[in-house]
Regions:
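Active-site-proximal cap/lid insertion segments
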Residues: 2-12, 24-32, 37-221, 233-242
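Generic recognition of well-ordered alpha-helical segments
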Residues: 19, 200, 222-233, 246
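A conditional alpha-helix N-cap/helix-loop micro-motif detector
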Residues: 13-17
Length: 246
């Protein structure tokens, strides 16, 4: 911050939400328009869920993508020699077979209670082949979705604040990401490859009075267009040396 380094203990997703709300409530000039970016990273590797959702989806089997066991026979050799398969390349940290070293005692107790019994059962099972891939996929996708659940909570809190403060009808909300992601598609996690699952990403806009709720626009947009769009909406001239367009 402008005042120096500030250390906050907690789950990063919750902290980002809390800091955003604190600025909206206490940090802005309420007589002026505002612009705030609330940027979450939890769904990024290594998909570390917060204490609230450590056991969410336990006892549920997530449907596997049809291409989870893709053999890449119709692709170039590079597709089969990459290092991002669920079968071979998820680390013990990715799979939560090791307890993170950055937890408080209270967080560690909750973590061990959630993952300890399941990890013990996995080690005893000595899975191989398709069964091992199935287990890894379930661990990966559930942790990913646990992270997303916390992000959903945070976004919901921000939208609720806008409603409660009568700001929703005069505020543009834009929800997006930096890229798509493989959730077991082609047997992969991560991004890297320009297939549809990685190339496409969400761009959801709530603009009361301008964009009809539920509408779909199929024009192509890139994330290098975002800054120009923000400037245009704010009535600020767009520098000629910026790429992209509003």
């Amino acid at each position: 911050t402008a005042e120096g380094v500030k250390k906050i203990t907690g789950y990063t997703t919750d902290i980002i939400t809390d800091v955003t709300l604190d600025w909206l409530k206490n940090g802005r000039d309420e007589d002026k328009p505002f612009f705030v970016m609330s940027q979450h990273k939890a769904p990024h590797r290594n998909w570390q869920p917060g204490p609230k959702y450590l056991t969410k989806y336990d006892g549920i089997e997530i449907t596997e993508p049809d291409t989870l066991r893709d053999d890449y026979k119709t692709r170039t050799s590079a597709a089969s020699t990459q290092a991002m398969t669920i079968r071979n390349h998820l680390s013990s940290n990715d799979l939560k077979l090791r307890t993170p070293g950055n937890l408080t005692p209270e967080q560690k107790a909750k973590w061990d209670a959630a993952y300890g019994p399941k990890n013990d059962a996995f080690r005893k099972a000595k899975l191989e082949g398709k069964e091992l891939v199935r287990w890894k996929y379930q661990r990966y996708i559930k942790d990913y979705l646990r992270c997303v659940a916390a992000v959903d909570d945070g976004i919901g809190q921000i939208l609720k604040y806008l409603d409660e403060e009568n700001l929703a009808d005069n505020t543009i909300v834009i929800y997006s990401s930096d890229q798509g992601f493989y959730l077991g598609d082609h047997g992969w996690y991560d991004k890297r490859w320009m297939y549809e699952e990685s190339l496409r990403m969400p761009l959801i806009v709530r603009w009361p009075g301008v964009i009809k709720p539920g509408g779909v626009d199929r024009h192509l947009v890139q994330n290098l267009d975002y800054a120009q769009t923000f400037l245009d909406v704010a009535g600020i001239d767009i520098p000629d040396d910026m790429q992209g367009r509003s």
